[in-house]
Amino acid sequence: MLHFPLVRIAAPLCHPSPEECSEDYAWFRARLADPNLLDGAVGVKVNGAVLLAVPAGGSRRGGYLSVGTVADAVRVWAALRGRSGFPRFRLSLSAHRGTCHTVNWGPRQPREDAERGRHFGYAPSAIDTFLFLHRGFRKGAGRCSSPETDP
């Protein structure tokens, strides 16, 4: 347990049930090469919602959570920092105040789609499906995407 002010600002953690985060669990279960990683998932409560943080392990080298404000990003960072399964923890703040702030763990994610899918531990079939559906669309697209929700 941290013994300095971060403890007071940290977002609450929970062990969400598959029912509580059913859409997230279903999404990850359909894509992860090792769905057993969901057993170590942690829920982070942000503005009344529970965000599912899936740890690194096996072929999954890293992950992230996306939040809407800098304050939420700092609270999530403070909550997950130092937890097992969340190595090399860091914040990535967007140039735009209210969008696309992420809390990342593991090595920096690759830029290339297939490599990024492997970085997040997705099954080859999930990566192939993503590449088929998004071929040519992602190059230079000016949208705020969530790499973990793409493949």
Task: Enumerate the language-model features and the residues they cover.
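A conserved ligand/cofactor-binding region detector
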Residues: M1-Q109, E115, P124-P151
